[in-house]
From Swiss-Prot:
Gene field: pnp
Keywords: Cytoplasm, Magnesium, Metal-binding, Nucleotidyltransferase, RNA-binding, Transferase
Cross-referenced InterPro entries: ExoRNase_PH_dom1, ExoRNase_PH_dom2, ExoRNase_PH_dom2_sf, KH_dom, KH_dom_type_1, KH_dom_type_1_sf, NA-bd_OB-fold, PNPase
Record-given protein name: Polyribonucleotide nucleotidyltransferase
Matches recorded under Gene3D superfamilies: GHMP Kinase, N-terminal domain, K Homology domain, type 1, Nucleic acid-binding proteins
Cellular compartment(s): Cytoplasm
One example of a Gene Ontology biological process annotation: mRNA catabolic process
Organism per entry: Pseudoalteromonas atlantica (strain T6c / ATCC BAA-1087)
Protein's job: Involved in mRNA degradation. Catalyzes the phosphorolysis of single-stranded polyribonucleotides processively in the 3'- to 5'-direction.
Family, per entry: Belongs to the polyribonucleotide nucleotidyltransferase family.
Subunit: Component of the RNA degradosome, which is a multiprotein complex involved in RNA processing and mRNA degradation.
């Protein structure tokens, strides 16, 4: 294959696409670079479908190599291991906009591997990974309705910024990634510092407009490569069988979708499916039961969508903008630092907040270096929450993605380290699920943090919106059920406060989602969000003044920087002895600030007292209680402060003559001594006899 290269300017960066040199045995491979950040994207697609395949087996793996940043991996094995959270999230980010662009009925296995081979810390890898994937698919010859463009949008000083650099993101009020085709937005992922609906929508439209540079460049690149298209045609629809199934099952399917209880509705649909399949297979033994089931699913979708578009009540009887019943409670787990139970219809989350010390922060070692994360949010989705059995183990991609979305929704209201020096971990346990458990996690997290006494800037609520569209007719749905998510055209999640949006995630399954539709969805989402916040505020409207009795308290004191070594001690011995004696955790900063974490004031007082003793200076003329540490011929050494000793000379033990030190003192003995002198070498001279009464002088004339 002849090497082909395409370069173009994209905002402040130069993008280069190259193929025909590397990974030539893959179906398609592209080396994509944005300045000096480069990724190798390979696409392999099987020409044949596995017999009985009934879903599209697309896999996306984004992987980072530490050599890309000139680093060697840590750990014993010194090689990359399981995917990091960022790698998992980026894999999902690439998957989401490309999956809906493969045609219905395409069931061939496709694997996309994106490998970061050169990384400039100022240029995030996700956008160039999406661009490279789009280019590789465009030249693969596979049926793909692309190409896809992608853009990162920042918002600083009232202006949108295209493809913000890492350092620019630190001052940006917005970090938004948008992907789409020439005519449609397909995916949005964002985190914002409480921005209005208009600003957020403007960012999406700005990103879509700018990404047309990518779409056009990839189109030209694919035309130059000119890969032959696969000889693939979707199987024609079995109209006869579809009509037969409709006649047999449409009425009962409509009745089933008037059952509001999720599990009862599920049972009714399963029974109807079994009954219909049996009837058709009995009439025609050669008929494939799997094909009947697939067409029944299409009927299911048609029934739900047609009812909504006709203005009839939704599955559970609600109108399009109505929110399910809410139930909110806080402080439900007595030994946790903060907890909440958030229930919205048949979706429920138990959320627990835990406060920790600096050493509890999560150390993230990425290509851009090591950073400590002081706020963690973990989302668990056990199989019982949907009435199923299943494997329980490490978190799956979906759980990691939902946890990160919930964290994005809360991040903007978290206090700074100076305002609240605790490390915070939140865990959301989904105990029931029927739509938008990630947004239930946002609501529950806001409640649990306030219950824990975390001074968040405002309450945050989240809501999931859906869409059913047919030609020009569309209906936006608030607080979607699982079935509405599955059978609808859009999943649109919005989190925010009463003042604005903190996170926006959007996945669109069809083209033709206009700016008007997104405006309607954002307006309806705001109304829903304000309603939920009103209910939440009735349970708890601000952070508690008192933290849980089981949460650590922080006590702070300041010492001279040259005393830090004294508090730490040789090999850390002193700091260990203080923490063990006081049952506290102690952290020392370079400027001499000491933070003591204790569950009780008395324990903190013990630690403070010991630190003050260690850092205190010995004063001449002052009396100390000390411990005899060594006996020598010429006197005894006494520890008067932790790590500070002085010498009691044999002549300073008693007023009378002392012939042997051991006759008066023993090692370990506690005695009172007076500091007589501190010489230029900081040697301390002590006296016992200065604290003793002098014996009375003998009377005159006595013999």
């Amino acid at each position: 294959m002849t090497p082909i290269t395409k370069s173009f300017q994209y905002g402040q960066h130069t993008v280069t696409l190259e193929t025909g040199v590397i990974a030539r045995q893959a179906t398609a491979a592209v080396m994509a670079s944005m300045d000096d950040t480069s990724v190798l994207v390979s696409v392999v697609g099987k020409k044949d479908t596995k017999p009985g395949q009934d879903f599209f087996p697309l896999t996306v793996n984004y992987q980072e190599r530490t050599y890309a940043a000139g680093k060697i991996p840590g750990g014993f094995f010194k090689r990359e291991g399981r995917p990091s959270e960022y790698e998992t999230l980026t894999s999902r980010l690439i998957d989401r906009p490309i999956r809906p662009l493969f045609p219905d009925g395409f069931m061939n296995e496709v694997q996309i591997i994106v490998t970061v081979v050169s990384a400039n810390p100022e240029i995030p890898t996700d956008i160039i990974s999406l661009i490279g994937t789009s280019a590789a698919l465009a030249i693969s010859g596979m049926p793909f309705n692309g190409p896809v463009g992608a853009a990162r949008v920042g918002y600083t000083d009232g202006q949108y910024v295209l493809n913000t650099r890492t350092s620019e993101l630190e001052i940006s009020q917005l970090d938004l990634v948008v992907a789409g085709t020439k005519g449609a937005v397909l995916m949005v992922e964002s985190e914002a510092e409480v921005l209005s609906e208009d600003v957020m929508l403007g960012a999406v439209m700005f990103g879509h407009e700018q990404m047309q540079t990518v779409v056009n460049a990839v189109t030209e690149f694919a035309a130059e490569v000119n890969t032959p298209k696969w000889d693939w045609v979707a199987e024609p629809a079995n109209v006869t069988l579809k009509d037969k199934i409709k006649a047999l099952a449409e009425a009962e399917m409509t009745e089933a979708y008037q059952i509001s209880d999720k599990m009862a509705r599920k049972d009714a649909i399963v029974a109807l499916t079994d009954k219909t399949v049996a009837a058709i297979v009995e009439a025609d033994a050669e008929q494939d039961a799997k094909e009947v089931s697939e067409l029944l699913h299409e009927l299911e979708s048609d029934v739900v969508r047609s009812r909504i578009l006709a203005g009839q009540p939704r599955i559970d009887g609600r109108d399009p903008a109505m929110i399910r019943a809410l139930d909110v409670a806080t402080g439900i787990l007595p030994r946790t630092h903060g907890s909440a139970l958030f229930t919205r219809g048949e979706t429920q989350a138990i959320v627990a907040a835990t406060l920790g010390t600096e050493r509890d922060a999560q150390m993230i070692d990425g290509l851009n270096g090591k950073v400590d994360s002081r706020f963690m949010l973990h989302y668990n989705f056990p199989p019982y929450c949907v009435g199923e059995t299943g494997f329980v183990g490490s978190p799956k991609r979906r759980e990691i993605g939902h946890g990160r979305l919930a964290k994005r929704g809360i991040q903007a209201v978290m206090p700074s380290e100076k305002e609240f020096p605790y490390v915070v971990r939140v865990v959301s346990e989904i105990t029931e699920s029927n739509g938008s458990s990630s947004m239930a996690s946002v609501c529950g997290t806001s409640l649990a943090l306030m219950d824990a006494g975390v001074p968040i800037k405002a309450s945050v609520a989240g809501i999931a919106m859906g869409l059913v569209k047919n030609d020009e007719n569309f209906v936006v749905l608030s607080d979607i059920l699982g079935d509405e998510d599955h059978l609808g055209d859009m999943d649109f999640k919005v989190a925010g406060t009463t003042e604005g949006i903190t996170a926006l995630q959007m996945d669109i399954k069809i083209e033709g989602i206009t700016q008007e539709i997104m405006q309607v969805a954002l307006k309806q989402a705001k109304e829903a969000r304000l309603h939920i916040l009103g209910v939440m505020d009735q349970a708890i409207s601000g952070h508690r003044d008192e933290m849980s009795e089981f949460a650590p308290r922080i006590y702070t004191l300041k010492i001279d920087q040259d005393k830090i070594r004294d508090v730490i001690g040789k090999g850390g011995a002193m700091i260990r002895s203080i923490t063990e004696a006081s049952d506290t955790n102690i952290e020392i900063e370079d400027d001499g600030t000491i933070k003591i974490f204790a569950t009780e004031r008395a324990k903190a007082d013990i630690a403070i007292s010991k630190i003050e003793q260690v850092t205190a200076d010995v004063e001449a003329g002052k009396t100390y209680e000390g411990k005899v540490t060594r006996i020598v011929d010429f006197g005894a050494f006494v520890e008067i402060l932790p790590g500070k000793e002085g010498l009691v000379h044999i002549s300073q033990i008693a007023h009378e003559r002392v012939n042997k030190v051991a006759d008066h003192l023993s090692e370990g003995q506690i005695i009172n001594v007076k500091v007589m002198e501190i010489d230029r070498q900081n040697r301390v001279r002590l006296s016992i006899k200065e604290l003793l009464e002098k014996p009375a002088a003998p009377a005159e004339g006595n013999e």
